[in-house]
Amino acid sequence: MLVEDVVILDFETTGLNPDRGDRVTEVAALRIRGNRIVESFESLVNCSVRVPDYISQFTGITQAMVDAAPAPALVIRQLLQFIGDDAVIAHNAGFDQLVLDSECRRLGLVNPLPDFICSVLIARCMFPDMKSHALGCLASHLGIPFAPGAHRAAVDATVTANILFRACDLIRTRFAVPRIDASVLRRIACAAQMAEISSAAISAA
C-alpha cells in the first residue's frame, strides 16, 4: 500500500516522435491513494493535426473524435493542475515525459514536474523472469483484465495502476518495506536501470 498519493499518467499520440511533430490525441491521469484509484482526469485532445489511419486502427481514436475535443492549451493546463505536487508514474515513462515536455514547450510553458517514475523499470525489478514487461504481457502474467487491442489512455493507465499494486505487494514482502512511497519506487526503478546499464557494459566489454 502506498503511503502517499501518486498519479498514473498515460498519453495516446499520433506517433512515437514528439520532437518530429507527433502530437497528443488523448490523456488519462489516475490518482492513487493507498491501494485504490480515488480520482481521475481524462480527455481527448485536438492538436489540429491529422490522425494517421494506423493510429485510429490501433487506438480506436478517430479524426472526428479528436476534432471535437478541447485544445491542448486547455487540456495540458488542466492536467498539470490535476497532478499538482504528486509524483508521476508511467509505463515507458521516458516517452510520456517527452510528450508532456513537447506539449508544454508548444504552449510556452516549462514542465514543472520532476522526472517520471517508470513502471517498466519497477516491473523488471519485481518480475525479473518475464521475457517482456510490456503492459499486455504483465497484465496476462498477473491475471489483470486487459482487453486485446485496448489502447486507450484510461485503459492503459488503469492496467498500469493494477500492475503497480501487485508490485507494491511484492516490495513490501520481499524487501520488508512497511511504508512504500514515491522515493521507494524511484529507488527501485533506478536500481533496475543501473542493472541494465551494468549488463550492457559487461556485454560490450
Task: Give the role of each language-model region.
Residues 1, 161-205:
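Acidic two-metal-ion nuclease catalytic site recognized across multiple nuclease folds
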Residues 1-114, 128-129, 133, 137-151:
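Conserved non-catalytic scaffold segment of RNase H-like nuclease domains
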Residues 113-124:
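A short, structured active-site edge motif that brings together acidic residues
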Residues 122, 138, 159, 163-166:
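Generic recognition of well-ordered alpha-helical segments
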Residues 155:
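Acidic donor-binding loop at a coil-to-helix junction in glycosyltransferase catalytic cores
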